[in-house]
């Protein structure tokens, strides 16, 4: 079975002297759509902040740290992996937001062909 997803991660990133990039996870929002739906106007989704592992909504297979391997360009101009190493706390301020919409779980070449996900007028509410 295949399904689309909406994912938002808030991270606080830093770079060491060797150009390695690290991040704390400050906020997490992961929504999978397990069934076909009609068009939804003004849909909103909660961002969970800090260490969410004890929350009832937490699902480790889709919300754990380093759930996917993501890359960034460091200060040396090199493409390097982002090492998500810890959960943030109430004192951490995010430096980066990762927002992903995918029509097929697992990305290209893994999901089912023919899936469609329409996204229109995305906005942040804070």
Question: Residues of each region from the PLM?
Answer:
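One-face residue pattern on beta-strands with alternating periodicity enriched for small/polar residues
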Residues: 5-9, 42-46, 98-100
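Extracellular carbohydrate recognition and processing domains
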Residues: 17-90
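Extracellular-facing segments of soluble proteins and assemblies that are Gly/Ser/Thr-biased and enriched
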Residues: 1-20
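Short beta-strand segments enriched in hydrophobic/aromatic residues
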Residues: 10-12, 49, 101-103, 126
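Residues that flank catalytic or metal-binding motifs in active/ligand-binding sites
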Residues: 2-6, 41, 113-118
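Extracellular carbohydrate recognition
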Residues: 73-78, 84-93, 104-126
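Short, surface-exposed beta-strand/loop "edge" segments at domain boundaries and coil↔beta transitions
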Residues: 15-24, 105-112
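Generic "edge-of-domain/loop-turn" microfeature
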Residues: 15, 52-54, 106, 124
């Amino acid at each position: 079975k295949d399904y689309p997803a909406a994912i938002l991660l808030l991270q606080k990133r830093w770079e060491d002297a060797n150009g390695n990039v690290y991040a704390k996870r400050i906020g997490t929002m992961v929504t999978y759509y397990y069934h076909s739906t009609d068009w939804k106007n003004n849909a909103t989704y909660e961002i969970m902040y800090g260490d969410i592992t004890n929350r009832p909504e937490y699902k480790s297979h889709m919300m754990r740290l380093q759930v996917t391997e993501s890359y960034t360009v460091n200060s040396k101009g090199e493409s390097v992996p982002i090492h998500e190493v810890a959960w943030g706390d109430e004192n951490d301020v995010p430096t980066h937001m990762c927002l992903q919409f995918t029509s097929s779980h697992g990305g290209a070449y893994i999901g089912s062909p023919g899936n469609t996900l329409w996204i229109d007028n995305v906005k942040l509410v804070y």
